[in-house]
């Protein structure tokens, strides 16, 4: 829907490919070992999954930004790709291409594999992390999720394991 809105003003005069190629989309992926807002995100997702209304507090977004900037993130990686070359005249195909481009750049962290281990999610051990790095991340995640309601814990772990699962589909 967002791509359609971006193209809206020029839809009649220029094709999807030509327009998006003229904008020079450059994929960027930021990955970090730990998300300081992981519990907040899991709580919000859980409330929505349970069809409960989630009411943000007045300064919740501001607090999330502050926490995201100043909170513990462990290892951080920023990857900047090359301009995306659009070849299909479809918003859906364009969105998939953008997603795939970002995923290819995304650097997995020990916490991603540790979450898979905790969840018993199978993955290809296609990484260069030591057993100790994975173990340390696992200990961190186990402490982080201690005392959380099982549904919230599962959603938090999924935030970490999902990049491994999605990258394995590439």
Where are these regions (language model features)?
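Membrane-interfacial terminal anchoring regions of lipid-handling membrane enzymes
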Residues: 1-170
């Amino acid at each position: 829907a967002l791509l359609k809105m971006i193209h809206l003003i020029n839809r009649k005069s220029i094709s999807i490919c030509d327009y998006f190629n003229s904008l020079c989309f450059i994929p960027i992926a930021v990955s970090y070992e730990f998300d300081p807002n992981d519990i907040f995100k899991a709580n919000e997702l859980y409330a929505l999954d349970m069809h409960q209304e989630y009411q943000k507090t007045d300064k919740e977004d501001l607090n999330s930004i502050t926490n995201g900037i100043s909170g513990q993130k462990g290892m951080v990686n920023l990857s900047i790709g090359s301009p995306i070359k659009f070849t299909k005249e479809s918003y859906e195909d364009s969105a998939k291409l953008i997603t795939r481009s970002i995923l290819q750049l995304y650097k997995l962290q020990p916490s991603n594999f540790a979450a898979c281990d905790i969840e018993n999610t199978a993955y290809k051990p296609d990484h260069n992390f030591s057993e100790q790095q994975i173990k340390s991340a696992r200990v961190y995640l186990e402490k982080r999720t201690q005392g959380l309601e099982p549904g919230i814990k599962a959603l938090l772990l999924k935030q970490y394991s999902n990049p491994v699962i999605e990258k394995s589909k590439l």
